[in-house]
From Swiss-Prot:
Lineage: Bacteria, Pseudomonadati, Thermodesulfobacteriota, Desulfovibrionia, Desulfovibrionales
KW Cell division (keyword) present: no
Free-text function comment from the UniProt entry: Catalyzes the conversion of 4-hydroxy-tetrahydrodipicolinate (HTPA) to tetrahydrodipicolinate.
E.C. numbers: 1.17.1.8
Family of the protein in this entry: Belongs to the DapB family.
Residues reported to bind (S)-2,3,4,5-tetrahydrodipicolinate: H150, G159, T160
The organism's place on the tree of life at top rank: Bacteria
Residues annotated to bind NADP(+): R36
Gene it is expressed from: dapB
Name the UniProt record assigns to this protein: 4-hydroxy-tetrahydrodipicolinate reductase
Coiled-coil parts of chain: none
HAMAP family on file: DapB
Amino acid sequence: MSTSIIVTGAGGRMGSTICRMAQEDPVLTLAAVVERPERLASLDVWKCPSGSDPDAVFATVPGGVVVDFTSPEASMANARAAARAGVSHVIGTTGLTAEQKAELADLARTARIFWAPNMSIGVNVLLKILPQLVQQLGEQYDLEMVELHHNRKKDSPSGTALRLAECLAEARGWNLPDVANYHREGIIGERPKDEIGIQTIRGGDVVGVHTIYAMGPGERIEITHQAHSRENFAQGALRAAKWLPQQQPGTLYSMLDML
């Protein structure tokens, strides 16, 4: 049975990748696309209905799944529209505030919503194994992270970096906002033990690199995840689009639920 998907932000880099891969997938149908009015003409290549009003477009695809890599504000508007239309909603947008995440969780009580700041299978497997690593190493190991992305990325640190850092903090029994350090400069004194440094690099066309450091007496462990193309994230999002309609509303689903 084919799953009908609606791609929002279809004129963007992620959106166009998702459209192409959806059309190549035998069990998916690209049913509609959504974009800003000034970009609609560029969507003719997909040969499917298009529009700029999420409410109007979503209503034309009953039982469909919205796949959304846009902006925090657009994704929240899309989430409300998807809930009104009764369609499922897969969100890969990063940079959501705590308030926006709370609203998604509230909407998910009666709607099917899936949100992951990183749709990569590898990153989400990493989220599963990091707690065991951190707990077995013990608190004598300092935890740091460096993330690298292209020069057009708007949020910093990346949503993936923050989720990985949350995972590290939770494994230590810490609250990330209390221990995260995003900036070091000048005479800052010795490094506190209860700290996680998160550093950001931006440049070129780098899709995404995240390196976690665990540094202890006489040794250092480095774990790096490197995304080579956006197809990695698109594949995870389309896998979620096939999975989500089979689930019941009531919780904000994530990659860890699907895996």
